[in-house]
Each structure stands twice: as structure tokens, then as C-alpha cells.
């Protein structure tokens, strides 16, 4: 029986990220972080939920009213986005214009929305773009 598949050998990991320049990666990753922040601001303005956020460079930390946290972090050397939540850590690479989990194949915004909903205790969906 073959051994475990490494991140770089998994089908989900073979992605368009290999052809991205560092500046393209930074631009695409920044779009993701900005979209998350824009959604949080919208929720606050609409009295939907107050999730505090703090962004430092490529790291965005979300803190929920319960005190729990979700962290989204860019990993420039790997051209990946990392998501840390109660359920674990996930690594995403850009594949066909979408950020896809390198292990399970899930899409970033769907997984982030699921994690936010679980930690907020109600359904919430993160918008894909800040526009």
C-alpha cells in the first residue's frame, strides 16, 4: 500500500500557483483578505454579528463574541493561504481561479464560511469579493 500523499504530490496541490509570480500571489491573497474584511464590516453595519478582526500584513485574525478565533494567514514562499480554526488547519493553493484545500479539495470561501458559521453559532457566508 502506498504511503501518505504529500501536499506537493496530491492532485489538489498541482495548481496554477506554480505559475504565479510572487507579486501575483500577493495581489490574489490580498484580494481574499480584503474580501473577508469587507464582509465583516458589512455584517457589523447591518447588525448581523460583531466579529472583531485584526490584520497584520498577511495575517488576519477573527475573534468571535465567544472568544474563539479563526486565523487566515498567507504563506508567500509556498503560494498558499492557511486557515486555522477549531476543526484544524487547512492549506489552500490557487487552482483554476479558486483557492482549493491541498488535502481535501474543499474551496476556501466555502470552508471559511462553514468555520465562521460553526464558531458564530449561526449560518454566515463570506462574500468572494469586496466589490
Where are these regions (language model features)?
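N-terminal intrinsically disordered, cationic/polar leader segments
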Residues: 2-131
